[in-house]
């Protein structure tokens, strides 16, 4: 793709998201969503392979459906209240339709089926954008309309997302699909606490984006897309392999790494609100995620696949491209747990 066209598309993508995040009018938010979608689809087809075309088509169909539902909810709300303001969503039907539309855009269960397939069909860099930047716009709208969202509907979708995110990733060998199912589970944790403590959702989002960015950057450094290829990097880049292992365990929520902090704070907040069954279910289903991350860690750093003698440790390691953001991202992804007491006071 022409670099100039790519810059224009990325600028439009950023502007579309910023328009959604900063607008208080439904029409401007809808236009922002459409700008974002129409800029992202050509980026997905940067390498015009059949898989990329299929992924782009699936993404277009799901996002167009979600946008149609969103506009339908806005029109119903407009007919009942005469309001275009985002925060004034009073009609229950409009609120339910809006929640479903945003759940489709986020990839929450039971509308999650498109996320693994689309992520698998696109390159790692585009997958990183899909699983991080593309979550900002729908979550910002959910944050604004959180007082009028149906609690039971949101909790059911959140719990289903955590369950499906763990369940779906169990038998995967493709790293992009594993990251997609992990994204579904993390979205479930974020939306579960949204109605009780929206600020905690933002903290969880920040940590999730940092961990996902770190993970994808490590995959890009290693040029790996499968479990097998990841397990064969120890003799070329031992330091990168070790960091990959730590980040994987952090994404699974294993203490004392950063990924444990948002889970701990969310369970604590739900318990304060006299909810016991929901956080118990969330903690148990989070073990599914932790299991497949630990299995991935085990196959990456602690075992050797059957191989030839050429797989022995090399005397000279591959030189890696300098990425200034990666060390900072790794520190945030693994060492934030000591800040928990301070953050719990602030939140």
UniProtKB/Swiss-Prot annotation:
Topology in the lipid bilayer: Multi-pass membrane protein
Enzyme class: translocase
Segments crossing the lipid bilayer: 1-21, 25-45, 59-79, 96-116, 122-142, 149-169, 178-198, 200-220, 237-257, 274-294, 325-345
GO molecular function: NADH dehydrogenase (ubiquinone) activity
A single GO cellular-component term on record: mitochondrial inner membrane
EC number(s) from the headed UniProt entry: 7.1.1.2
Reaction equations catalysed: a ubiquinone + NADH + 5 H(+)(in) = a ubiquinol + NAD(+) + 4 H(+)(out)
Job of this protein: Core subunit of the mitochondrial membrane respiratory chain NADH dehydrogenase (Complex I) which catalyzes electron transfer from NADH through the respiratory chain, using ubiquinone as an electron acceptor. Essential for the catalytic activity and assembly of complex I.
Stated name of the protein: NADH-ubiquinone oxidoreductase chain 2
Protein source organism: Balaenoptera physalus
């Amino acid at each position: 793709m022409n670099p100039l066209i790519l810059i224009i598309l990325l600028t439009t993508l950023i502007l579309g998201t910023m328009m959604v995040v900063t607008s208080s009018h439904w029409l401007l938010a809808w236009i922002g969503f459409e700008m974002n979608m129409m800029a992202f689809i050509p980026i997905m087809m940067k390498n015009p392979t059949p898989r990329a075309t299929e992924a782009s088509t699936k993404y277009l169909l799901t996002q167009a459906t979600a946008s149609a539902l969103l506009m339908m909810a806005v029109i119903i709300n407009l007919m009942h209240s005469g309001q275009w303001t985002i925060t004034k969503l009073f009609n229950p039907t409009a609120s339910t339709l809006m929640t479903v539309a945003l759940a489709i855009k986020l990839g929450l269960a039971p509308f999650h089926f498109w996320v693994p397939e689309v992520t698998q069909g696109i390159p790692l860099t585009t997958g990183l954008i899909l699983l991080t930047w593309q979550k900002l716009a729908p979550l910002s709208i959910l944050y604004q309309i959180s007082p009028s969202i149906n609690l039971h509907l949101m909790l059911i979708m959140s719990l289903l997302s955590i369950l499906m995110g763990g369940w779906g990733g169990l038998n995967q060998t493709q790293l992009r699909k594993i990251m997609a199912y992990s994204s579904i589970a993390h979205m479930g944790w974020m939306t579960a606490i949204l109605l009780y403590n929206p600020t905690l959702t933002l903290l969880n989002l920040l940590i999730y984006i940092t961990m996902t960015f770190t993970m994808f950057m490590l995959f890009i450094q290693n040029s790996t897309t499968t479990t097998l290829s990841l397990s064969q990097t120890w003799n070329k880049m031992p330091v990168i392999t070790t960091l990959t292992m730590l980040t994987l365990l952090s994404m699974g929520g294993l203490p004392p790494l950063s990924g444990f902090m948002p889970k701990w704070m969310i369970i604590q907040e739900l318990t304060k609100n006299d909810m016991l069954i929901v956080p118990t279910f969330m903690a148990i289903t989070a073990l599914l995620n932790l299991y497949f991350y630990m299995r991935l860690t085990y196959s990456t750093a602690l075992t050797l696949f059957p191989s030839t003698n050429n797989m022995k440790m090399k005397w000279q390691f591959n030189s890696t491209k300098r990425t200034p953001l990666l060390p900072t991202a790794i520190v945030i992804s693994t060492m934030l747990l000591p800040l928990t007491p301070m953050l719990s006071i602030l939140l």
